[in-house]
Amino acid sequence: SKRMQTLFDGGRGDEFHIYYGPSGSDMMYWPLLMQSMLHPGQTITNIVSCPEELGSGSILAAEGMYYANTNQYGEAVPKGDLVTDSFHVDVQFLPAREISGHIADRKQAIRDIIAARPGQPIVGNLVFGSKSGIKDDLDIIDEFREGVMWVVDMCQFRTHPALVHELLSKGVMLMVTGSKFYQAPPFCGALLVPKFWTELLTGQPAEHLRDYGRLFTAADAPPDLPQLRSIWPDHPNAGLRLRWEIALDEMEAYLSIPQEETDALIRRWSRVVIGRLALSDRFGMMPDMELTNDSIISFTVSAGGRELDYDELKKLFDTLVLGEHPSLNGYNRVFLGQPVRYGQRSFIRLALGSYSIRKLMEPNGFDPYNDLHVVDLIERTAIELFES
């Protein structure tokens, strides 16, 4: 916790607390639990932006349901069932993209939902860096500083410490993971919670959340909330803590490099890879790329004269990720972003992580050979699978 605070609030330790969970999807539960403690017996409105571009479990978690078949203890849990019936959630999903693929403007829909529910507990989940790098207009937060528990999904963590500090200072909670941009092992989630929210929860009853002990351990809640720690299993997740240590090592190394240098490298990489994609008729860039994060490139893939659908992209993804590729320079395996649906269409993604950026900035110079060769492999594999 102290290492994270040093990175994002200058080490003062008085700006936020850290709430843990085994994955980014588990972070969707925390605001619901908090609102149920602050407003017992009331229905919680949960506004969720860009659900199709969040983690695979986030949609079920947003409704207070188990999103997987196994919990962090290795026990079986009933995926799709409510974790508890002690509070009710009214979920309002706001799609990320129009049918055309263009990024949707969700601000007015959010205003309408809030206006229709005066006095009700509301959680507003925005995204800043979805699977395709979409960034919600965070100005909506300033319109409703009171009455909404704002949460920004930064699980990709492709942002600068200054924005993290700014949002926390506005009372906004931040969902983060160490396993996306910072390339730590998967299942590495945390929620950064402004300290005043924890203070509001102090002393609030929590017995109705006992069933959430099937998902969270006592150590996942901060010491300031003994009413939660006392009803959840005393079963510290050592693996989670180790994964965060790895993530923090990488964060410290990356953030020690001047921001203008890393930003320039990311822009250069993006131009080079997009240039390669543009050379082939089999690739189509997603609309509004200029509105997304430069370290994520989203594109459709075509073969046999037609655009591949989700299942075909999944087959392409599995073939590439599970196979070995000795033609790569120094490596023989690849990983890329899993397919994402929008309407009836789908796309895949290439993304640049912090470790990769640091390698590209080494004295040997900028060498995008492997990145360009991955595009070659995608094109070649699509032809083999769907044109032969």
Regions found by a protein language model. Give the residues of each.
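Conserved small-domain helix->loop->beta segment predominantly found in fold-type I
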Residues: 251-347
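Conserved active-site segment immediately N-terminal to the catalytic lysine
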Residues: 165-179
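Active-site C-terminal subdomain of aminotransferase-like
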Residues: 179-293
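Active-site phosphate-binding strand-loop segment of PLP-dependent enzymes
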Residues: 84-151, 158, 181
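Conserved N-terminal alpha-helix of the aminotransferase class I/II PLP-enzyme fold
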Residues: 1-26, 30-42, 51, 75-77
